[in-house]
Amino acid sequence: MSTAIEDPRAAARDDWARAATGQPDLALARASADAGFRSYWRATVPGQGSVVVMDSPPALEDVRPWLRMHDLLERGGVRVPRVLARDTDAGFLLLEDLGADTLLHVIDAGNADAHFDAAIDQLLRIQAIPAPDDLPHYDEALLGRELRLFDEWFLGRHLGVQPGCGDLEALDLAYRVLIDAALAQPRVLVHRDYMPRNLMPVDGGLAVLDFQDAVAGPVAYDPTSLFKDAFLSWPPERVEGWLLRYHARALDAGIPVPAAPERFLRDARLIGIQRHLKVLGIFARLHHRDGKPKYIADAPRFLAYLDDALPLHPELAPLAGVIERHVRPALATATAAAG
């Protein structure tokens, strides 16, 4: 039995790509998949070079939010992949091929300053674009739902920890601090996953990927995501230097960051703590619900970020206590069992 018969989606993808390129014999090869339901397929078009097909099954992941944000960013001067053909009903896009290596693959201690300057270039362009009135807001409800991913998926499902009433109260108090701090920040267009794996070196600069979940939210969110990455870590002193570099350039560009660098660094730490807790929950959910175990291996990185930030915020001592009482013992037990 042929692959096309076994997988109707594959047959539809092949047929669409061949029609879109005018190449009846076009062969697609998997390029990558992401943490959602989209997949990417590469092909070579004679006389034109390589192209990429984005496959976003409509019943699982609507392609329209991606396209809407793509077009908004492109109009604002942000470098994004060019869309060569689109079929929103079927969930297929034909994109320019930006290559196989994201910034995550090429950045290192020696070239990080130059690459992060290029990343700041694109981020300032994003933040200068007025957020559409109907764009979702990083509001109290969304911030709270994200924080509860830590309780449900990382503590409960992954570590098997069932916090008692006192622990839940401690988390509630800490979450209140984090939510209030986020809501007090100036609001801009927020990518929500602005980090090296979603940036592509191209044309002497960087192109931006994976922007479909953008919201209107805290100005410190994206720079914090950039320098406190999910997949690689930098010395704290370099992170602070890059945050201050971003802050100075943002002030010059008219982005509504606080004038005082110390206040901006505080905002970055607090929104970073919120993000680290959320990501721990998301990585655990990807592992246990979605069968994608590779992400949870980076959990220690986020605990290290929390170790750096929490001592600077005594108002978050209840959260630090929960981590000491429950997270570290559970991880130690799991590590011993695995060894």
Name each model feature, range by range.
Residues S32, R38-L143, R148-L149, F154-G160, ...:
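ATP-binding pocket architecture of kinase catalytic cores
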Residues H115, P186, H191, V215-A216, ...:
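Secondary-structure capping and boundary motifs in well-ordered enzyme cores
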Residues V279-G339:
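ATP/Mg2+ or Mg2+-diphosphate-binding catalytic cores
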